[in-house]
């Protein structure tokens, strides 16, 4: 029985590649393969052959978002250089290229996207949420330098400070507090402050740092 299971699983794996390839035009299949493998010259060839730089894979992600998700910086640069590239195209989950770069803590691409004019703010989840949750103080500062809304709220009312606190990202918490994040806000689901999320996630040292910040400003911790 076990041997039969593994045989069926192996067949499924072998068939998945051709099945996926058949669902996209050949040119787009070549583009996404090149993007995932960071083969910049092959990406250029696909685009020169007329493949849409904003093409989407079977999961609905654009080639640029796929490149960033795979840390394929060379491929991403080729795509961003294309006339008509949509830097603001969203994946089905709402992610943009900048959000993915922040999530991957890919500072060079974050810098490049910002230089090219990628939007920092939007309703709901933002790149700053992802940078804070990932703990990158550098990217958090970069986004704030480009006017990121420091207390941006996710659909459930989560702020970047809450995300950083919940994930135990002390450096990001320090940056956000130093730059004016409101530590008294509560989310709309659990009705917790950033310190409350830190405690809920068993990160008491983060909660202590936030409470000390509030106390220094004469605000009673909640």
Model feature map: region roles:
Residues 16-18:
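N-terminal signal peptide c-region/cleavage motif recognized by signal peptidases
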Residues 24-33, 56-62, 90-96, 121-127, ...:
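Ankyrin-repeat boundary/"N-cap" motif
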Residues 33-38, 66-72, 100-106, 130-136, ...:
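Ankyrin repeat A-helix N-terminal signature
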Residues 4-5, 20-49, 58-61, 77, ...:
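Intrinsically disordered, low-complexity regulatory segments in ankyrin-centric signaling systems
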């Amino acid at each position: 029985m076990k041997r039969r299971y593994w045989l069926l699983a192996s067949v499924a794996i072998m068939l998945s590649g051709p099945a996926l390839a058949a669902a996209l035009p050949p040119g787009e299949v070549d583009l996404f393969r090149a993007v995932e493998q960071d083969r910049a010259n092959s990406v250029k060839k696909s685009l020169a052959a007329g493949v849409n730089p904003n093409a989407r894979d079977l999961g609905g992600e654009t080639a640029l978002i796929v490149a960033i998700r795979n840390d394929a910086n060379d491929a991403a640069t080729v795509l961003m250089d294309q006339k008509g590239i949509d830097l603001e195209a969203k994946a089905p989950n709402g992610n943009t290229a900048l959000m993915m770069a922040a999530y991957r803590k890919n500072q060079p691409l974050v810098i490049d996207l910002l230089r090219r004019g990628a939007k920092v703010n939007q309703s709901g989840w933002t790149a700053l949420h992802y940078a804070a949750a990932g703990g990158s103080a550098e990217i958090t500062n970069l986004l704030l330098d480009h006017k990121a809304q420091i207390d941006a709220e996710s659909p459930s009312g989560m702020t970047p400070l809450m995300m950083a606190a919940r994930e135990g990202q002390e450096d990001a918490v320090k940056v956000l507090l130093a730059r004016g994040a409101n530590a008294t806000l509560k989310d709309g689901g659990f009705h917790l402050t950033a310190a409350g999320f830190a405690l809920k996630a068993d990160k008491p040292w983060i909660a202590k740092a936030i409470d000390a910040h509030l106390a220094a400003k004469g605000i009673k911790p909640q």
